[in-house]
């Protein structure tokens, strides 16, 4: 795909030249490789006003910026002219879009990156992205209230998909139908922070590796809330102002979790080390800005792979291996402890004592 190739060629050197362009727009040609054998066109038509669409663009355009144009609607006729079918990146952010038609992107068969952030979108048509091999969709800062996971079914052929739904009004996320004709969306990164979710949504069967629920009004995290997310490696539950306690074994469905962020939860109380039961691969734990101050020995017992913990205000604890003054006896294990100090001290402290 064009975006992937673009990133691979960055290391080979870039030469930028200006090309003739539609009045008001800027067209830059970036050439790569030996003897400038490959080129991409980036067209910037931002901040010109709604009259700019549909705008003619060069046939070999890879990225089009239509941001900040006060656009109120986007449909197939706006995005269907010559040069649009090979687009790899499209920026429609900071407009006045309140809706998009189901076929708006149907001709963009090579589109990988789509930015619809900072608009007024209240709903997503079903299967609106199915024609494009998208790998990155930014829908942050809109007015979405109810979103169906099936809306993110793309023509990606198994490639990872990153979806940003942060800063919306989402109170309900509809799970993917178990008997759907199309395969489940390949969402690996999902940002749901700062919405209106009162419970952890059902995300089972998604190949998630990153999930953020920061800033939602979650009142509790029920047992089994993360069922079906065994591949998750990074979970952020920061700034959940309403949550008071975590259930014992609440994360046991996440055996592959490596990073857990529980920072900024001032009402969250310690409920025992059983909360972290089953997190045998967890390496980073952030408890800063919360009332959780567990004993280091307790954490290491339940989290054998733990490398660092943030607690209180600017206190960082790091995993240390104490070798002692004498050589260990054959078969004995070194003593592992958590050494805590301010962030600067932890940054320069040794790993082995």
From Swiss-Prot:
Keywords from the named record: Developmental protein, Glycoprotein, Leucine-rich repeat, Neurogenesis, Repeat, Secreted, Signal
Domain of life: Eukaryota
Every LRRNT domain range: 18-59
Keyword Glycoprotein tagged: yes
Glycosylation-annotated residues: 75, 138, 191
InterPro entries (alphabetical): Dev_Immune_Receptor, Leu-rich_rpt, Leu-rich_rpt_typical-subtyp, LRR_dom_sf
Signal peptide: 1-17
Role of this protein: Contributes to various developmental events and other processes such as wound healing and cholesterol homeostasis through its interactions with multiple signaling pathways. Wnt signaling inhibitor which competes with WNT2B for binding to Wnt receptor FZD4 and represses WNT2B-dependent development of the peripheral eye. Plays a role in regulating the hair cycle by controlling TGFB1 signaling. Required for the development of the anterior commissure in the brain by inhibiting neurite outgrowth. Essential for terminal differentiation of hippocampal neural stem cells.
Subunit structure: Interacts with FZD4 (via FZ domain); competes with WNT2B for binding to FZD4, inhibiting Wnt signaling and repressing peripheral eye development. Interacts with TGFB1; the interaction contributes to regulation of the hair cycle. Interacts with netrin. Interacts with CCN2.
Protein name (record): Tsukushi
Species per Swiss-Prot/TrEMBL record: Rattus norvegicus
Upper lineage: Eukaryota, Metazoa, Chordata, Craniata, Vertebrata
């Amino acid at each position: 795909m064009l975006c992937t190739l673009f990133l691979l060629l960055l290391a080979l050197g870039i030469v930028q030249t200006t090309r003739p362009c539609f009045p008001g727009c800027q067209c830059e040609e970036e050439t790569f490789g030996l003897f400038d054998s490959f080129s991409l066109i980036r067209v910037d038509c931002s901040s010109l006003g709604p009259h700019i669409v549909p705008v003619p663009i060069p046939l070999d355009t890879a990225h089009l910026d239509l941001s900040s144009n006060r656009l109120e609607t986007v449909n197939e006729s706006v995005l269907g002219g010559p040069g649009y079918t090979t687009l790899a990146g499209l920026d429609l952010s900071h407009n006045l879009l309140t809706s998009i038609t189901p076929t708006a992107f149907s001709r963009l068969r090579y589109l990988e990156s789509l930015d619809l952030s900072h608009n007024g979108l209240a709903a997503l048509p079903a299967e609106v992205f199915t024609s494009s091999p998208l790998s990155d969709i930014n829908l942050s800062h809109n007015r979405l209230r109810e979103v169906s996971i099936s809306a993110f079914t793309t023509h990606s052929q198994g490639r990872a998909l990153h979806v940003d739904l942060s800063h919306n009004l989402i109170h309900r996320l509809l799970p993917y139908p178990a008997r759907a004709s199309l395969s489940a969306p390949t969402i690996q990164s999902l940002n749901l922070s700062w919405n209106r979710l009162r419970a952890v949504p059902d995300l089972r069967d998604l190949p998630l590796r990153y999930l953020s629920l920061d800033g939602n009004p979650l009142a509790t995290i029920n047992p089994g809330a993360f069922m079906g997310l065994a591949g998750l490696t990074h979970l952020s539950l920061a700034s959940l102002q309403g949550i008071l306690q975590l259930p014992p074994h609440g994360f046991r469905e996440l055996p592959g979790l490596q990073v857990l962020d529980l920072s900024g939860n001032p009402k969250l109380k310690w409920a025992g080390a059983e909360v972290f039961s089953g997190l045998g691969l967890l390496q980073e734990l952030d408890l800063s800005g919360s009332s959780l101050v567990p004993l280091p020995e307790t954490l290491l017992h339940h989290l054998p792979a733990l490398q660092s913990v943030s607690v209180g205000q600017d206190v960082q604890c790091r995993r240390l291996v104490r070798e002692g003054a004498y050589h260990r006896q054959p078969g004995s294990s070194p003593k592992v402890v958590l050494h805590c100090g301010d962030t600067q001290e932890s940054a320069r402290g040794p790993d082995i004592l």
